[in-house]
Amino acid sequence: MSTKKIILKSSDGHSFEVEEEAARQCQIIIAHMSENDCTDNGIPLPNVTGKILAMVIEYCNKHHVDAANPCSDDDLKKWDKEFMEKDTSTIFDLIKAANYLNIKSLFDLACQTVAEIIKGNTPEQIREFFNIENDLTPEEEAAIRRENKWAFE
């Protein structure tokens, strides 16, 4: 028995054939699938590049519940950890794509990965990581550190 496939089109013109059941993890794709004319010609995803869409599809295929190929929770956690071993720019692109496509599990995984990266860093390191300019005066910063002394211990 063959499974129904749909075509997803990235912002840079790449097309990907995906099993409909795996694609159903993306809420925006479900909305497009209800409009039959979109599925016939492919579903355009103007906010996702081909490189990132390929990764999203890989994630959805792995997380798709497939009775024929069950995956234990431990195996899936290990796979997720290895999947997120990417440069920070790619992780941020995955966060944006997961948010746009409304894939909560991928969004949560990518955000948790960023949280683990910055965990234990100083405020200065976190500002540098996110490219945030420090707009506090030295006096304001000192007052905040005094008020929240427990957080800096």
Swiss-Prot record:
Signal peptide: none annotated. One of its GO terms (biological process) is protein ubiquitination. Keywords: Nucleus, Ubl conjugation pathway. Expressed in leaves, shoot apical meristem (SAM), roots, flowers and pollen. Residues 95-153 are annotated as: Interaction with the F-box domain of F-box proteins. GO terms for cellular component: nucleus; SCF ubiquitin ligase complex. Pfam families: Skp1, Skp1_POZ. It is found in: Nucleus. Pathway: Protein modification; protein ubiquitination. Its main location: nucleus. InterPro entries: SKP1, SKP1-like, SKP1-like_dim_sf, SKP1/BTB/POZ_sf, Skp1_comp_dimer, Skp1_comp_POZ. Belongs to the SKP1 family. This is SKP1-like protein 9.
